[in-house]
Amino acid sequence: MSRKSNETAFALKMQTTPNVFDAPNTTTDMLAISNLQFSIAGVTVTNNEYTGSIHKNGDDLAGKTVSGSFNVYLRPPGGADVPAADAFLIGRILKAAKFAEVRTSTAIPPAAAALGVGSDPTHAVLGTAAATVDDTYKGMAIVLSDIATTAYDRVTAVRHYVGTSKSAELMEVLGAPPAANYQIPKQLSYQRDMTQADAPSLSTKLWLGGLRYDLVDCQVSGLRWNVPVSTRDAASQPMLEVSFTATIANYDDEASPTVPALGAVPLFKDGKFWVAGKAVGGSSVVIDFGLRVAYPPNPNYTEGSEPGELVESRTTINMDRKAYLKAQFDTLAMAQGQAQYGVFAQWGYASGRMVQIVVPDARFNYQSPNVGQDFITEQGDMWVDVFNRNVCLNFVYYA
């Protein structure tokens, strides 16, 4: 019988000790992936010895590199409450890419409270119980009870927070100042970790048509969030595009376990997309974290190198965005000025199924017009500098 591509399965677990495989559970640690590419490549050294003829001997085999890539749909955890620590499988990938998992398991305050005095369309002044430390709520979801009639439209996000005045700058511009209640809802957040601590590694199992690979010291070497807009003409799921490197700890013949069906993925539509204080149209937004992994040389290891470590990340945002008139949205002036602007995407209709991407500050590169289709669009990058919580991903549980 032939091995079949569809009989592919993947499981992952946070690894506690370098070079020691932690076996993932074949029930609770199974992650649905797609578009897998997997490579085992030889590391060779040319043999330059003379042979007394025009012919040369083959290369010496020095070792191997193991790498791959896959996509995983950006499916929220769902359920009625925030998952337990480290239970959300996509979160393990994010932690290995230098994100911190932050669980807000109780809303703040537990019951919605009255706003303070002085709110305007871009700021919500929180009530007396709100935190007094700057940026406590930066990058997090917030519910403002009077900004919309539907529950999911009452959810927005905090760009910056000033503790002394309890003023939360918002990621969108409201039609009128909020004047009723506020609450920081329960949420599972992944906030970019700016500490010097090394990103953790993963232990993974990969089944390819009845053959299992145990991969140790699995390091996320590339990460992109690809969020296409679903329209009346075409639809596509938001996803994480993941690259990895690893070492083979073991391999054996083993039937691929079943990967559970997890239901539909929320699509990016009927939501919010704000850039620089304007609700904009477009067909996609992609965040590339520009990860780079290196391997310290060490002859005590089988391959002559220690496990890979993240050594660099350079984050950019690329959009295919609707083009506007100068008076509406002047990207040329914004690029020339090099000020910081917020980028905010939100979608999903239900509590536990809502997704937010919050980039509080990013700078425009020059944007190029694209005239090749029915509508003129602009394409170009925005640069994300090194700030605390410079990119946040929230899964929101709201009442």
Give the predicted meaning of each segment:
Residues 1-399:
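Signature of extracytoplasmic/envelope-associated structural regions
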